[in-house]
Amino acid sequence: MKKVFYILLFAGMILSGQVMAQNKLNFGLSQPQDKATLPVSSSKPAVALRKVKTANPSTLEKVSDNEFLLSTGWELTDANRLTASGESVFNPKLNTADWYNATVPGTVLTTLVEQGVYPDPYFGLNNLYIPDSLCRKDWWYRLPIKLPENSSGKSVWLLFNGINYKADVWLNGKLLGHIAGAFQRGEFDATPFLKSGGENILAVHIFPPRNPGIPQEESSKTNAGPNGGQLCLDGPTFISSEGWDWVPGIRDRNIGIWQDVRLKLTDGVSIIDPQVIADLPLPDTTSVSLTIKSIIQNTSARSNQITVTGRIDQIEFSKMFYLKPYESRTITLTSQEYPQLKIKNPRLWWPNGYGRPELYKLNLEVKCNGNGISDQKIIRFGVREFSYEMAVAQPDKKMWRIEFNPIQSAGKVLFNNIDRVDMGNGTFVPQLVSSADPSLLTSIDKDSKNPFLTIKVNGIPIFCKGGNWGMDDGMKRVSREKMEPYFKLHKLANFNMVRNWTGESTEELFYDLCDEYGLLVWNDFWLSTEGYNLNVNDNQLFVANATDVVKRFRNHASIAIWCPRNEGYAPLLIEPQLTALIANEDGTRHYQPNSRNLNLRPSGPWHYLSDGADYYRSIAEGFSTELGTPSIPTAATIRSFMPLEDQWPISDTWFYHDLHDGQKDYLRAIETKYGISETLDDFCKKAQLVNYDSHRAMFESWNSKLWNKTSGILLWMSHPAWPSMVWQTYSWDYETFGSFYGAKKACEPVHIQMNLNDKKIIIINTTLKSYKLLTAKLELFDLSGKKLSAKSISTAVPANKLTETFVAELPESAPQVYLLRLTLTDKNKVVSQNEYWRTNEKEGLFDELNQLEAPYLTAKIGKQQNPGKTIIVLSNQGKVPAIGLKLNLRDPQTGKIVLPANFSDGYFTLLPDEKKQVEVEWNSAKISNPEIIVEAYNLKRQGIAMVK
């Protein structure tokens, strides 16, 4: 069998166009690693205590009159145990005392951890104590359900919004159907199999992927190991759950009912996958024409008169027609037929920093033969229109820069991504397909030197800034309560784009929150690095999942790009299907066939650069979907996920939490710049200054070339999937640190900066507002806070442009360590302030900071704006600067840091006799009166003295 498998696999790679030496492909580990290389803790293993199973009756949580969530009363067991019992899962009187109370939505591992079978895998080395066999067995979910009172005479449907990896769905011993792939819905007509009285037994048989792979466990004796392995063969699934260099192997590979389950009632007719298309007469945005499309399906054996009714705010419309028995029809409602669908002065959806992300709701209802509502859909959408500037190759191979608006191309495929043309330096451009109509494109430059993608929203070019999400949560625990603070942090960091890397965060809530917070989405599908990671075994399954994802999520305003894979092109058998899918089933967005290279710059680097000016000199250009540097969190965060014995010095537990070989330069820089660390707190405070400078440098290098063949930069990564020591701007527990504030500073909508390569002082304005006169000021201060020099200039600052001011003249007589502060003001109101601690030493030594005395800080609480939001006025009444100031809130009862708590600034300098206002926001429902604590490079964490 093994021989046959590899023959078929190789044949598949030939057909897919991925013909290369077998030894270049990553199959992961073929056997578990040597036990001598496993990470070791100095702490005793955690002991889990299983909870007693409780009676948890199922309930129907009402969503609407005809729709209910099935989230309580679920039970779980592994199939081997059920088989050994000799009992039938369909028996209403089955004794389930030895089953688990299941969490739905949730993975198998989520249930087992919540039920105390295994310890929290995110703490220390606990993940090692959870058997990897969880992903190598079948599981059964079971739910007794009673029908709602209003179900009589109606069709009853069961809707599964996401299972992993495959499932058979049974009701009262009858097979309803199958679901395959982690991202495909399953909807089943349960009506013929239901009992009108008493309980119905819903049972779901979960099958794991066939190729779960073997994770490498990272330690000080190993490197990060392979990124993934055999699990890639089974895509679409969560391929990183086999283990990547930012997350360990998740023991169940996230199998289970990971999204919600619903019961729906209809009365003979259903609405299927409606779509709202907003067409603006760009550049005019004072009106919009809406088109509404939907499949209407007659699910009955009789002909029916159908009435579809829609409502958007105060606008109403309806359409009546007839459907034959079991007939499905796509209806299209346009503003030509329904003039009310042309809306004047619409509220536009904008990315963060460009305007408000306004959203509308369409309430679509369908009735059958004049009876009550049979089905209803509420679709939230934004009035916005995407267009894309990019280059294509002409027959003479010269670059033609064009603007492409998918709505205008009316579902036609225009680009030939397979016969692409190499433009040098790792960047390619597509050709036009032979049948392409050039009149569907807007010509910008027939002899362009700019191959790179620019995304435009409502006719305005957007300077894309943000980061990658490898996975929202390593165990797919994705409630709104848990996830929303992360999106809020992205907004507060002034980001406007996130990348759904290899599609592993594909769920409704992810897109809902991106819509609400104005975050554009670069959306990958479920393939990774071409030529290294394996292609999928089942192309048909892959395309089926992709089709369902596009139909399901295409109304989300935030999705800007569909992309087939991380770092590469789709296999040749899949590529034309995906191209046609996006054109036909979406028709409003660009299909970007590669996450690097095609109309993009190559991705990386991902390691620390000792000289931030190198980003300016050789890296900043074009649009990059991955640029990263390590990012160790605060000491408080490390203490929260690691036993005391492993916290300091650096231990195997650090390595298991993603501190790997690629961070040697980063660790060396912390020591070289700031000195050898004696404690965890000492090390982490130094790391935060490195984090701040490195993350700011990446974004500011892109700023320095705004619209000069430069249009977007996404961090690898902005969001952690678990408690990590590597790529992130905040920690998994919402703690913000140097990386967050450095990125936030550089991504300010109006920002003043000094280019590290040429010392130019420039102003970046990525807003739609022009300023007639702003004043840019440069000041130098020594370590006592004494001002050494100053220079200022006033200038106009146009909207969405870079403005140069002057070159910073840094005196040779400056002390070894000094502060360079830039301030941008509008009539004495600070618009932007940016600080660089500088050194005259070539190696950038800041050891003089270690000799500073502690400042004396006081605080005054300003007027509380509302519960959970207030202003803190900090004052430095000491004789030395407070460097790298970091604020937190603390629970006075427990002494623990309050998270999330969002501060408007962090890791800033407060000179002697200076004051600074900092705004803080937290969840006042959890704690109403927290303490304020402060720490700095030269100040240990302490409560702060309050003054009147």
Task: Please tell me what each predicted stretch does.
Residues 674-685:
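Short glycine/proline- and acidic residue-enriched helix-loop micro-motifs
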Residues 1-7, 20-465, 470-473, 477-497, ...:
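Secreted/periplasmic carbohydrate-active enzymes, especially glycoside hydrolases
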Residues 7-16:
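Bacterial N-terminal signal peptides
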Residues 15-16, 512, 537, 639, ...:
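Residues in and immediately flanking transmembrane alpha helices
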Residues 232, 665-674:
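Active-site-adjacent bridging/hinge elements
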Residues 433-434, 440-445, 497-661, 669, ...:
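Substrate-binding/catalytic cleft of secreted carbohydrate-active enzymes
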Residues 351-354, 685, 689:
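Short, conserved micro-motifs enriched in small and acidic residues
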Residues 96, 254-255, 635, 663-667, ...:
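Alpha-helix initiation and N-capping motif
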